[in-house]
Amino acid sequence: MRVVFSSMASKSHLFGLVPLAWAFRAAGHEVRVVASPALTEDITAAGLTAVPVGTDVDLVDFMTHAGHDIIDYVRSLDFSERDPATLTWEHLLGMQTVLTPTFYALMSPDTLIEGMVSFCRKWRPDLVIWEPLTFAAPIAAAVTGTPHARLLWGPDITTRARQNFLGLLPDQPEEHREDPLAEWLTWTLEKYGGPAFDEEVVVGQWTIDPAPAAIRLDTGLKTVGMRYVDYNGPSVVPEWLHDEPERRRVCLTLGISSRENSIGQVSIEELLGAVGDVDAEIIATFDAQQLEGVANIPDNVRTVGFVPMHALLPTCAATVHHGGPGSWHTAAIHGVPQVILPDGWDTGVRAQRTQEFGAGIALPVPELTPDQLRESVKRVLDDPAHRAGAARMRDDMLAEPSPAEVVGICEELAAGRREPR
């Protein structure tokens, strides 16, 4: 088969696609990764073939264009909310109205859609696999009649939000049945001569989910579970990591997609100070810019600009992070208890469900204090229940089909959806 993978302009989102792309290639299929030019180097560094299309979407410019009010609004959304009193029509319509022109349309600009459609028309793939914020991919798949699937990187919050929205849509007066996402996708499909809009363009014809069942949201969609395989980009294991730690080790990271100088109201210096008297070796993945102005680094803290998480976390007794997909999945697949500092989007759902499963502690950022962080780290280190919960989660993830097995499942599903050419 010819298989297209596509990601928004973020290396952390791209990295989630890489292991399955490798598996398709190893099974003898032709693979192309179609994305904006900014990802070309990261794609080729992963040993994959890049097809740069469109113009770059600068995430800093995106944030500036969206504005702080929009960013703050999106961060404030509680995707774990189930109370009908909160999930009103006005609330759900507001979400669709804000997300469609910002996070959805801006991440798939016209140049990217045009490039995706043009490439798929010429190369004629048999399958398109896309991450959930790259709508250019399902648009191109629909226009060319190609089977397509989403590969998730976290709880399927956008589908849950849309299902809640669609559930209330028929109850509205006909003249007020607005659907911003369907409207954008409808006229975009028409522009390229595609079929009528269908919800498959939003959710894929099937979904591939690398998270354990305990973390997934029940959306009722056809879902293929997949064992998570960690990929952190090209990396070298530092010499000090070859040695067994002399005492318990804790990883402290805010991820690679966002190099912030604080989380909520807590600065990097306060984070480091909070873990300074924890009886453990702290490996803090902060670069020089993040450490600028930090006057005191505790004696038990080693700061490193980058270290491959798949090499570091198996040596750790716990990890503290922002709830991002790479940090979370890598810790989970290695059975490491987690202290999660969720700061918006899907991180709150991921943190809440991890705590409910017994594999860690969730500390919502707005209420975060250094004292809370210190005590939470001590709890996950000293309470065997957290280690047991993390081990159960690891076992659940290891029981999922490997990427190689998922290739076979996708072959069968694609064969059943392929249109005559």
From Swiss-Prot:
Q: Which pathway is this protein assigned to? A: Antibiotic biosynthesis; erythromycin biosynthesis
Q: What keyword terms does UniProt attach to this protein?
A: Antibiotic biosynthesis, Glycosyltransferase, Signal, Transferase
Enumerate the Pfam families for this protein. Answer: EryCIII-like_C, EryCIII-like_N
The record describes the protein's role as: Catalyzes the conversion of alpha-L-mycarosylerythronolide B into erythromycin D in the erythromycin biosynthesis pathway.
So what does this thing catalyse? 3-O-alpha-L-mycarosylerythronolide B + dTDP-alpha-D-desosamine = erythromycin D + dTDP + H(+)
Oligomer status and interactors: Heterotetramer composed of EryCII and EryCIII.
As for family, the record states: Belongs to the glycosyltransferase 28 family.
Q: Which GO terms describe its molecular function?
A: hexosyltransferase activity; UDP-glycosyltransferase activity
Which Gene Ontology BP annotations are present?
antibiotic biosynthetic process
Q: What is its EC number?
A: 2.4.1.278
Q: State the organism named in the record.
A: Saccharopolyspora erythraea (strain ATCC 11635 / DSM 40517 / JCM 4748 / NBRC 13426 / NCIMB 8594 / NRRL 2338)
What is this protein identified as? 3-alpha-mycarosylerythronolide B desosaminyl transferase
The residues the entry assigns to the signal sequence are: 1-23
Q: Which PANTHER family match?
A: STEROL 3-BETA-GLUCOSYLTRANSFERASE, STEROL 3-BETA-GLUCOSYLTRANSFERASE UGT80A2
